[in-house]
Amino acid sequence: MIILKRAGGSRRSHMKESQNLENLWMPFSANRSFKARPRLMNEAKGMYYKKVDETLVLDGTSGLWCCNAGHNHPKIVQAIQNQAGKLDYAPSFQMGHPLGFKAAEKLLSFSPSSDFQYVFFTNSGSESVDTALKIALGYQQHRGKKDKTILVGRERAYHGVGFGGISVGGLPLNKKHFSLLDNVDHVVTTHNLEKNAFSRGEPEWGCELADDLYRIIEKYGADRIAAFITEPLAGSTGVLIPPKGYLKKIREICTEHDILLIFDEVITG
């Protein structure tokens, strides 16, 4: 936790202590504007938030895609209460607990391929991305491919707020103030309003944009590229569905050139 001292000025003394909004630095928010006209959610049930003034707000993004079964679902609430009353926390460093192994087995039972054999749990999307990048680089080193150190992302992509995710992500404003990872490049985005503005489902236009990965391969050589990362569905940059055949073509190119493919997926499951 980092606490920054205010450069000057006084707190808004008219605000009750229980309503003091000064101390929380909110991510991806215009803090001054928010605190001048706060939107405070007090409860949630089903698909709605309830503000402190009792106004209902439709949650169109399922709590940043974390509550796809709805808010305050009774079975989920009961499961959380039961587990907290039995074992609230157990580290996974040199010890474990039965439900962790059970959850991993359950997840693999949903897998479309027997190639998936292991699950590594993380605490957030940002941590997941940085962990996936580290696993990819470590895997290439472990199998003797020591020159495979280049990571490839896409323009306009969002991969969280860790240094790895910002580096492979394609949002310039997120990179503006930071020194990023070396050995990172990007293919073009599939976002094109002129071609896909009113598409329903997967757009018909844009599969050929997957071929831009060949440009990166020609630039560096496949023997230097460790992994390609993409969002199957780009959420925070517009809920953009990939063109028909795009992901299949990306998969084929990566397989052909011995490049790992990372799907950063938190929305469609």
What are these regions (language model features)?
Residues 7-12:
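Short, low-complexity intrinsically disordered segments enriched in A/P/G/S/L with frequent Arg
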Residues 15-48, 95, 209:
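Active-site-adjacent loop/helix segments that line or gate small-molecule/cofactor pockets in enzymes
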Residues 28, 56-145:
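Glycine-rich loop-to-alpha-helix module at the N-terminal edge of alpha/beta enzyme cores
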Residues 51-52:
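Short, acidic, Ser/Thr-enriched surface-loop or helix-capping motifs
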Residues 105-227:
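PLP-dependent aspartate aminotransferase-fold enzymes
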Residues 235-236:
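Alpha-helical transmembrane segments of integral membrane proteins
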Residues 240-269:
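Catalytic PLP-binding core of fold-type I/II PLP enzymes
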